[in-house]
Amino acid sequence: MQDTFSSPEHFTVLLREAVGGLALKENGIYIDGTFGRGGHSRFILSQLSKKGQLIAIDRDPQAIQVAQNIQDSRFRIVHDSFSAIPDICEKLGLTGKIDGILLDLGVSSPQLDNAERGFSFMKDGPLDMRMDTTQGLSATEWLRLVSEQDLAWVLKTFGEERFAKRIAQAIVGYNKSAVQSGAEPLNRTLQLAELIAQSVPFKDKYKHPATRSFQAIRIFINSELDELEKVLNGALNVLAPQGRLSIISFHSLEDRMVKHFIRKQSKGDDLPKGLPLREEQIQHNQKLKPVGKAIMPTEQEMAANVRSRSAVLRIAERI
C-alpha cells in the first residue's frame, strides 16, 4: 500500500525508517538534501512544531517546481546540489546547529519514467541523464568527446562493468563512424542500450545488459560520488551534537562510501600505538557513532515498489 506521504508518481523509499532515524525533535532544524517529490520532507514537516525548520535541497528544476507548491513558513527550498549543504548553512548562520540531514541518493521514479530525461534504457528518449538540466554536458555531448580509454574507465569504475572495454570500443567506434559519414552520433537512449546489448557476449537473464553502463554514465555525468564525498565530509561541521545523518543508497559504490565514512569517523583519527591515553581521550577523537545496523526495505515494500529492492539505509549520530 502506498504511503500517504508519497506522491502519486513516486513511492518514497524507506520513508518511516529514514525519517525515524533522524530522531526528530519537534523544535529542531533539519535538512532534506534530496527533495525529489517531497515524500520525506512532508513527513518531517508533519512531525515538527511551529518552531521547527526544514531546509530542502534539490538540483532538479522539476523537483524545485514541486517544492514551491509547499506553502509552509517552516519550509525553505534551495536549488542546488546537496554538496552545497555546508555553504548553505554558513549563509543561513546554521553551521553546527543542524539536528539532522536526510539523503535519498536514488534517481526518482519521475526521473526514470520521463523518457525526456534520458535516465532509462527501457524508454526511448534523448540521451541526457543530467540531474540538473541547466548545467553541464549531457550524456550525448560527453559521449561524442570521450576517448575509448576514458569511457572504459568510467564504465569499469562506476558501473563495475566486466565488458567495459568492449562496450567503450563499440560506442566510440559508432560515434567516429557517424561523424565520418555525416550521420548523427548516438543521441537516443534505446539506441545506446541496443548498441551495448550487441557488445556484451553474455546476457544476464535477470538484468538488462545496459544496466551497469547507464548507471556508470549517469554517475559520471552528475559527479555523484564526488558530491557524496563532499557532503559526508561537510556534514561533520554542520551537525549539532547528537545530530543525525540518515542516508539511503541504491548501489554498492554509494553504500560502501557511506559505510566506510561512518566507520572511520566512529573510530576517530589514527593514533600512534602505545600512547598512554585514557578511554575518554580516545573517544574524544571520535566524531560519529553508528546507530543500529543497515536497514533494508521489507518484503511488503519491495512488492509495492520493485525499485526499492536495492535500497540500504545507514544512520549515524554526531558525537
UniProtKB/Swiss-Prot annotation:
<feature type="binding site">
    <location>
        <begin position="38"/>
        <end position="40"/>
    </location>
    <ligand>
        <name>S-adenosyl-L-methionine</name>
    </ligand>
</feature>
<keyword id="KW-0489">Methyltransferase</keyword>
<dbReference type="GO" id="GO:0005737">
    <property type="term" value="C:cytoplasm"/>
</dbReference>
<dbReference type="GO" id="GO:0070475">
    <property type="term" value="P:rRNA base methylation"/>
</dbReference>
<dbReference type="InterPro" id="IPR023397">
    <property type="entry name" value="SAM-dep_MeTrfase_MraW_recog"/>
</dbReference>
<protein>
    <recommendedName>
        <fullName>Ribosomal RNA small subunit methyltransferase H</fullName>
        <ecNumber>2.1.1.199</ecNumber>
    </recommendedName>
</protein>
<comment type="function">
    <text>Specifically methylates the N4 position of cytidine in position 1402 (C1402) of 16S rRNA.</text>
</comment>
<feature type="binding site">
    <location>
        <position position="58"/>
    </location>
    <ligand>
        <name>S-adenosyl-L-methionine</name>
    </ligand>
</feature>
<keyword id="KW-0963">Cytoplasm</keyword>
<comment type="similarity">
    <text>Belongs to the methyltransferase superfamily. RsmH family.</text>
</comment>
<feature type="binding site">
    <location>
        <position position="104"/>
    </location>
    <ligand>
        <name>S-adenosyl-L-methionine</name>
    </ligand>
</feature>
<dbReference type="InterPro" id="IPR029063">
    <property type="entry name" value="SAM-dependent_MTases_sf"/>
</dbReference>
<dbReference type="GO" id="GO:0071424">
    <property type="term" value="F:rRNA (cytosine-N4-)-methyltransferase activity"/>
</dbReference>
<dbReference type="Pfam" id="PF01795">
    <property type="entry name" value="Methyltransf_5"/>
</dbReference>
<feature type="binding site">
    <location>
        <position position="111"/>
    </location>
    <ligand>
        <name>S-adenosyl-L-methionine</name>
    </ligand>
</feature>
<keyword id="KW-0698">rRNA processing</keyword>
<keyword id="KW-0949">S-adenosyl-L-methionine</keyword>
<feature type="binding site">
    <location>
        <position position="82"/>
    </location>
    <ligand>
        <name>S-adenosyl-L-methionine</name>
    </ligand>
</feature>
<dbReference type="InterPro" id="IPR002903">
    <property type="entry name" value="RsmH"/>
</dbReference>
<keyword id="KW-0808">Transferase</keyword>
